UniProtKB/Swiss-Prot annotation:
Record keywords, A-Z: Host cytoplasm, Host nucleus, Phosphoprotein, Virion
InterPro entries xref list: Poxvirus_A19
Biological processes, Gene Ontology terms: viral transcription; virion assembly
Organism the protein comes from: Vaccinia virus (strain Western Reserve)
Record protein name field: Protein OPG146
Amino acid sequence: MDSTNVRSGMKSRKKKPKTTVIDDDDDCMTCSACQSKLVKISDITKVSLDYINTMRGNTLACAACGSSLKLLNDFAS
């Protein structure tokens, strides 16, 4: 018997997979004026959309402070 293939009584262990916990509260976007948390796209089915105030075009109004929120590419035009 070859001694290189036998592990003299040691059991082989499986490595546990590394897990990382992602805190969803930290990556939520906030309003630049009042720092209130905005709805994430993944939460859109869980939230009532009655409070969203749409202005003209792609501009939204923050429900907490009323400031206008628009996409960054709208500032270039």
